[in-house]
Amino acid sequence: MPKTISVRVTTMDAELEFAIQPSTTGKQLFDQVVKTIGLREVWFFGLQYQDTKGFSTWLKLNKKVTAQDVRKESPLLFKFRAKFYPEDVSEELIQEATQRLFFLQVKEGILNDDIYCPPETAVLLASYAVQAKYADYNKDAHTPGYLSNEKLLPQRVLEQHKLNKEQWEERIQVWHEEHKGMLREDSMMEYLKIAQDLEMYGVNYFSIKNKKGSELWLGVDALGLNIYEQNDKMTPKIGFPWSEIRNISFNDKKFVIKPIDKKAPDFVFYAQRLRINKRILALCMGNHELYMRRRKPDTIEVQQMKAQAKEEKNHKKMERALLEDERKKREQAEKEKEKIEKEKEELMERLRVIEEQTRKAQQELEEQTRKALELEQERKRAQEEAERLERERRLAEEAKSALLQQSESQMKNQEHLATELAELTSKISLLEDAKKKKEDEALEWQTKATMVQEDLEKTKEELKNKVMSSHVTEPVHGENDNDEGDESSAEASAELTSAAAYKDRSEEERMTEAEKNERVQKHLLALTSELANARDETKKTQNDIIHAENVRAGRDKYKTLRQIRSGNTKQRIDEFECM
């Protein structure tokens, strides 16, 4: 039995190990990878490797893995990457797994500065990346420093602004909060919708020369072929949509593109190496096929995938809605519980106050009762004293009467008796005064006792009312593989004609996400203003200067596309030859 070969395939978020046979083809390995990761939108992807000369190359699916220029090491190393890009991510990327792989690959390209991204857009994209990873911002879980170990911005952007790590985090965190309620997969899609408007997104650049020998860049992307000047990879000068191209071929380093327009001459350029022409041909064939496929009705398989994805998304939305409803109910229950606890505390405090008031009232009542008893005793004593004085007065009256009688009978002792009578009269007068005084005192004590009794009755009534009010009831709460050609082959060609989609150039009518989406537009304007004060103008790169000039001129990716495709094919080819 032949000895197996170890293979390691690295996707954007996983590392896979396989054992393959020496006879295993590129397609068999590719199929094994996509099956393992559960990917169905396979036409965008390919397996990339470094050949023995150190060049990055795509694995040919129709050849044995071992027959290709793969470095003989163990394990054999491959990267599973997007080889072709969609025109519109929101229309073409169906599966969540596909969306995630594109999101991670595009994010890596932006962070590595392979795709130029202006600072304000970089911060906004970073906030979507944070939402995709951490979900909704939570101040209790996402404490200061929660992004300190994350690479979220290109190094160029960090160096161009006088902001420290904490200040960058603060800005990203503010926009992270703005995305509350957005699903992780929706955050990734929002990231891609903005990123696809970046000028360098999805473009494969190749160094070429025209017949004059001018050094230029050829850009191959989902929409066609574009020509760039040597010092500007962001603003194409001439464009050819796939619908204008009939045939592409190369002979050694010479590459020939035949337009559909028979009046137009061939579009000829020269590459530095034969292998570059092979790669250009493969990319042209793949991108052209996808371009035409998009302009035809969806296949049954794609229709099924879209229906399934829609069903899964709706199911997730329902689950999300249920979870959100549960969260709201839980928050409401917590609020109710807090309210009940607060009401309970308030009631307990009121009860304590009432009890304190009752205790004080009871003390006052007892004091008043004691005073009332004392006053009653005083009254009784005064009354007894008055009665005693009354008795003494009567006795004095009787004595006076007796003395008068004696006075009549004993005239002899008249002087003596008169003196005695005067004394008794004086004594009687004093006793009457004392009696009157005691009667007045008794009356005064009687009045005081009556008032105390009334106060006592009033206090009893108040106490009764307070006790009644204290009984408060608490509330009840409740790929078509595109062979780049054999290394021995120095020429190849491919027919690209497809009359059905010749006139469909809807991409020229597109608008950027910022132009369509007012919310994104506002966010970008706010970020531009916010970062302006911290920007170090001395650290601007060539791309920054080009971008700023494009913004000032009112140009964007799609307006530029319309402009560079204007005029007939012949005019544009002539323009290319003059560059």
Swiss-Prot record:
InterPro entries: Band_41_domain, ERM, ERM_C_dom, ERM_FERM_C, ERM_helical, Ez/rad/moesin-like, FERM/acyl-CoA-bd_prot_sf, FERM_2
Main location: membrane
Keyword Oxidoreductase: no
Membrane-protein topology: Peripheral membrane protein
A GO MF term: actin binding
Null allele phenotype: Morpholino knockdowns show intersegmental vessel and axial vessel tube defects from 39 hpf onwards resulting in disrupted blood flow. Loss of intersegmental primary lumen in intersegmental vessels at 32-33 hpf, vessels instead show a narrow and disorganized appearance without a visible lumen at 54 hpf. Reduces zo1-expressing tight junctions and cdh5-expressing adherens junctions along the length of intersegmental vessels during tubulogenesis between 32 and 54 hpf.
Coiled-coil intervals: 306-448, 517-551
Listed SUPFAM superfamilies: Moesin tail domain, PH domain-like, Second domain of FERM, Ubiquitin-like
Residue ranges of the region described as Disordered: 308-341, 376-418, 464-519
Entry keyword annotation includes Chloroplast: no
Pfam family, one: ERM_helical
The entry's keywords: Cell junction, Cell membrane, Coiled coil, Membrane
Segments forming domain FERM: 5-295
UniProt biased composition (Basic and acidic residues): 376-400, 502-519
Subcellular location: Cell membrane; Cell junction
Low complexity bias: start-end ranges: 490-501
Role noted for this protein: Positively regulates endothelial adherens junction formation and stabilization. Is thereby required for intersegmental vessel luminal membrane formation and stabilization during tubulogenesis in the early stages of development, independent of blood flow dynamics.
Protein name per UniProt: Moesin a
